[in-house]
Amino acid sequence: MRNIKLIIEFDGTNFCGWQRQIKDRTVQGCLEKAILKITGEKSLTNGSSRTDGGVHAKAMVANFITNSSIPGEKFREALNTKLPDDIAVIKSEEVDMDFHARYSSKGKMYSYTIVNRYEKLSFGKQYVHHVRKELNVEDMKKACECFIGKHDFKAFMSPGSSAKTTVRTIQEFYIEKNEDVIKIFISADGFLYNMVRIIVGTLINIGTGKTKLEDVDNIINDGIRKRSGMCVPPNGLVLEKVFY
């Protein structure tokens, strides 16, 4: 038996997330069908993140066990001939048997992109969140500093999570602005269900003035979901990198 690691990029627009489902189109489902076609084996893949529908990835990591004799680095080319156009394997390699895409991970980085302009948006809507009201980006940047470090992020989690603890450590959190495009980067040792999207919603509230900058620490410490921001749409979210 051999353990194959894949780095995958995908456009999440037309997927119902990563995790395989009986009827709906998912990234994991398409990947496992492609593996079956080239190896003749029904392999179960492990993914580094269980992304929701509409969320994209530049570097999702997956692994699977196989008895195939195909060289590890050749799986990239072989799988890409069988995968749909909105999924691509960008690297493949054989790794130690104890490697697990999810449980071996030490952290992840996500980005979220906002287009901040009053005019309607017609191009690239599947990759950004359009905010018409002018945002105070300087206040948003200051708010990022409040989130860095080890905190209980209960206020930034949607219902339905099976997480044993709501404590996470954010290592990096910063914003880059280029004209009307605001790109938010956040990396942590792990994320709760919808945590990134709710934190971004909170930043937007700060940017519009709905939430005061000085209230951020209390929102984090109180742990009350209704005090934090909305869960912004999935389309602006990208899994940028997984750390091992």
UniProtKB/Swiss-Prot annotation:
Keywords: Isomerase, tRNA processing. Its EC number is 5.4.99.12. GO terms for molecular function: RNA binding; tRNA pseudouridine(38-40) synthase activity. CDD domains: PseudoU_synth_EcTruA. It holds the Pfam family PseudoU_synth_1. GO terms for biological process: tRNA pseudouridine synthesis. Substrate binds at residue 110. It catalyses: uridine(38/39/40) in tRNA = pseudouridine(38/39/40) in tRNA. Signal peptide: none annotated. Homodimer. Formation of pseudouridine at positions 38, 39 and 40 in the anticodon stem and loop of transfer RNAs. Belongs to the tRNA pseudouridine synthase TruA family. This is tRNA pseudouridine synthase A. It comes from Clostridium botulinum (strain Eklund 17B / Type B).
